[in-house]
């Protein structure tokens, strides 16, 4: 298990407060959203995996925002298709 230092991750993000927010969002995605990790898990908890992803530059606030926007657009398109299908069947 590779050791993660907070300082390395802070250098990628800019400050500790943003690091906490980004790591928490990413850990929540993996834990409850069914998102796969971008680094080997090695029996680590989602928070540690999130910090490793940030440290390696794989996850940033911009990446998380873009992914969430894309997922929301896909969900809205699916809902619109379902509503259209229901309307056609009436």
UniProtKB/Swiss-Prot annotation:
It comes from Vibrio vulnificus (strain YJ016). GO terms for cellular component: DNA-directed RNA polymerase complex. The RNAP catalytic core consists of 2 alpha, 1 beta, 1 beta' and 1 omega subunit. When a sigma factor is associated with the core the holoenzyme is formed, which can initiate transcription. Promotes RNA polymerase assembly. Latches the N- and C-terminal regions of the beta' subunit thereby facilitating its interaction with the beta and alpha subunits. This is DNA-directed RNA polymerase subunit omega. Gene3D superfamilies: 3.90.940.10. It holds the Pfam family RNA_pol_Rpb6. One of its GO terms (molecular function) is DNA binding. SUPFAM superfamilies: RPB6/omega subunit-like.
């Amino acid at each position: 298990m590779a050791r993660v230092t907070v300082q390395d991750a802070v250098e990628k993000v800019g400050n500790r407060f943003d690091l906490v927010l980004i790591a928490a969002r990413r850990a929540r995605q993996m834990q409850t959203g069914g998102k796969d990790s971008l680094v080997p898990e090695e029996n680590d908890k989602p928070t540690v995996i999130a910090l490793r992803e940030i440290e390696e530059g794989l996850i940033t606030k911009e990446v998380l925002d873009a992914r969430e926007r894309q997922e929301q657009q896909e969900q809205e398109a699916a809902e619109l298709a379902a509503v259209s299908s229901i309307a056609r069947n009436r």
